[in-house]
Amino acid sequence: MTTILTRPADGEGSVQVHQDPALNIQEETLVIAVYGKGGIGKSTTSSNLSAAFSKLGKRVLQIGCDPKHDSTFTLTHKMVPTVIDILEEVDFHSEELRPEDFVFTGFNGVQCVESGGPPAGTGCGGYVTGQTVKLLKEHHLLEDTDVVIFDVLGDVVCGGFAAPLQHANYCLIVTANDFDSIFAMNRIVQAIQAKAKNYKVRLGGVVANRSADTDQIDKFNERTGLRTMAHFRDVDAIRRSRLKKCTIFEMDDADEAVQAVQNEYLRLAQNMLDKVEPLEATSLKDREIFDLLGFD
């Protein structure tokens, strides 16, 4: 059951969504929440990272936490129905569902779930995330999983869409080398600072995406205590993989650019498995970011 409480120690008195402790994912599972500015490539990053973990022999579950339910289509090669849609079909009697009703097998055995969400302007996305985890636990689908990846909607950091942080060991932030992406990243750091007071989630690092250079990201990292875990340039093969509805690991291996991207994802996955040192980053005030970034 999901409850809404007011807890000043978590988010400076804002209304937060807190999950039932019974919904906690077992300690031995690596749980990663992927955040970033809307449209920055979180789903691409999440799906390719899931594929990389699977290539390393891990049992992987990816949970899309966006009403658009497009997180996993490069893994499954199709748009799959959402948990909220399936629950509506059975009038929210979850006991009537079977795992195959809402869990779909994708590339290299990656298990895929799209939580979906309430209609625009209504309901709470955090509730839907909680219901998804509850379903997975009821059907014992988390017991045989090594890695869980939450792919989270845009840069929304309200109590609802911060809910995956309550399950995660690490948060990865996807960003480009521009002001808007880094500004959004700073807000996400603030959300993680709030959640880390009461939950185990810690910052894992930054994924630089669609960027030839990282000078602005490097400035921000140095000032806040973040680090870049992986760097993906604006490679056309990544764009083409989305159009082909597949992961980067299903593209032509003979292409050196494809190989480079594959290797970077494998390196990132291995680093996360090696239990990276969590970061104690400090967010900046809006004016500080404005003064820090850019050129004199």
From Swiss-Prot:
Class in the EC hierarchy, top level: oxidoreductase
Reactions that this protein is recorded to catalyse: chlorophyllide a + oxidized 2[4Fe-4S]-[ferredoxin] + 2 ADP + 2 phosphate = protochlorophyllide a + reduced 2[4Fe-4S]-[ferredoxin] + 2 ATP + 2 H2O
Cofactor: binding comment: Binds 1 [4Fe-4S] cluster per dimer.
Binding sites annotated in the UniProt record for Mg(2+): S43
Key words, A-Z: 4Fe-4S, ATP-binding, Chlorophyll biosynthesis, Iron, Iron-sulfur, Magnesium, Metal-binding, Nucleotide-binding, Oxidoreductase, Photosynthesis
Protein's GO biological process: light-independent chlorophyll biosynthetic process; photosynthesis, dark reaction
GO molecular function: 4 iron, 4 sulfur cluster binding; ATP binding; metal ion binding; oxidoreductase activity, acting on iron-sulfur proteins as donors; oxidoreductase activity, acting on the CH-CH group of donors, iron-sulfur protein as acceptor
Listed PROSITE patterns: NIFH_FRXC_1, NIFH_FRXC_2, NIFH_FRXC_3
Named cofactor requirement(s): [4Fe-4S] cluster
Gene3D superfamilies in UniProt: P-loop containing nucleotide triphosphate hydrolases
Entry function: Component of the dark-operative protochlorophyllide reductase (DPOR) that uses Mg-ATP and reduced ferredoxin to reduce ring D of protochlorophyllide (Pchlide) to form chlorophyllide a (Chlide). This reaction is light-independent. The L component serves as a unique electron donor to the NB-component of the complex, and binds Mg-ATP.
The family this protein is said to belong to: Belongs to the NifH/BchL/ChlL family.
Protein name (record): Light-independent protochlorophyllide reductase iron-sulfur ATP-binding protein
Organism of origin: Synechococcus sp. (strain CC9605)
Gene coding for it: chlL
